[in-house]
């Protein structure tokens, strides 16, 4: 089997719905921390328009970025799901889910991981790692979304 195929998969609709429901619950509970990767090594060679920093500042200019991300992540649906990917750099962490949404007539690529672990060693807090929240370099196609009608 192709290594790339092992790293990417399409989860069943029920699994994706469960993930989205848990994501919303974690955000609404108020106990989740958002870890937003604003500056990424890959961004050094990328057009600034396609970086996390630019996209969030452009879409939510007068908002606290963490609060804006919490709101936007809580609005994700099964229809926004694209795929699930394994993070080779951190193989013991949970898989990352990739979603896509349209904002101001531009596609936004969203890649997140929810870790239900204690990162502060005190309160049992969970965290959501937002690796990507940036304008898509390549426009999405309908077939990118397995659960859109």
Across the structure, where does each feature detected by a protein language model lie?
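Functional cores of ribonucleases/endoribonucleases
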Residues: 74-124
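Weak global preference for isoleucine
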Residues: 10, 27, 34, 82, ...
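Compact soluble domain cores
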Residues: 2-93
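Enriched for short, Lys/Arg-rich terminal
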Residues: 114-149
């Amino acid at each position: 089997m192709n290594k790339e195929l092992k790293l990417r998969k399409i989860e069943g609709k029920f699994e994706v719905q469960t993930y989205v429901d848990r994501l919303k619950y974690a955000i609404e509970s108020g106990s989740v921390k958002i870890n937003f990767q604003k500056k990424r090594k890959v961004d050094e060679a990328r057009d600034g328009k396609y970086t996390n920093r630019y996209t969030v500042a452009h879409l939510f200019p007068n908002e606290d970025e963490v609060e804006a991300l919490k709101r936007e992540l809580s609005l994700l649906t099964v229809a926004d799901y694209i795929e699930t990917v394994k993070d080779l750099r951190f193989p013991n962490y949970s898989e990352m889910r990739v979603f896509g949404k349209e904002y101001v007539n531009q596609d936004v690529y969203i890649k997140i991981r929810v870790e239900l672990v204690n990162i502060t060693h005190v309160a049992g807090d969970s965290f959501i790692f937002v690796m990507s929240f940036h304008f898509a370099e390549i426009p999405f196609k309908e077939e990118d979304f397995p659960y859109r009608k």
